Amino acid sequence: MTTPKIQLAGVTKSFDGKQVLRGIDVAVEAQESLCIIGTSGCGKSVSLKCLLGLIVADGGSIKIDGQEILGANRKKLEATRRRFGMTFQFGALFDSLPIWQNVTFRLVQSQKMSRDDARQIARDTITQLGLAPNVIDQYPAELSGGMQKRVALARAIADKPEILLFDEPTS
């Protein structure tokens, strides 16, 4: 049997005494897709944030390729996060940055690439998602909500992550 790419076992999380996650058990194999559906406030976003180590689960186990990340040190969490691309429930674009910088923010921070290389990656990724190449010089407020969602998706895939997570992908 192969080790799951992602495995959550018995994951729990509470906020102010209210339990949001109660013993979540999920295993996702490589090349497999999983969709978690539930009512508003049931813990879908919290599960993803625990998986990324953005918030710490109260208990259970969270593994990526068999490596425990729950309780991992900052360096290990950062290395794990680099393997993921994610779109958040709310676009989370930087209003003060042009689209090309929004798309390549993580790439530039982690790989110290040139401005020209970053702009080209942004242009290629934006075009791949059906937006006009000239969009890269605009700012988020100049785009429709749907276009902003595509920019958030472009940012998630620009550095070709190993694992993609989408919070509210149908919105």
List PLM regions with ranges.
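Helix-to-loop junction immediately C-terminal to a conserved catalytic motif
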Residues: L52
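Conserved ABC ATPase "signature" region
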Residues: Q67-E68, R115-N134
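ABC ATPase NBD coupling module
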Residues: I69-G85, R115-D116
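Short coil-to-helix segment of the ABC ATPase nucleotide-binding domain corresponding to the Q-loop/switch region
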Residues: S96-F105
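Conserved ABC ATPase signature
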Residues: Y139-L143, M147
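Conserved catalytic motifs of ABC-family nucleotide-binding domains
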Residues: K160
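Catalytic Walker B motif of ABC-type/P-loop ATPase nucleotide-binding domains
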Residues: L164-D167
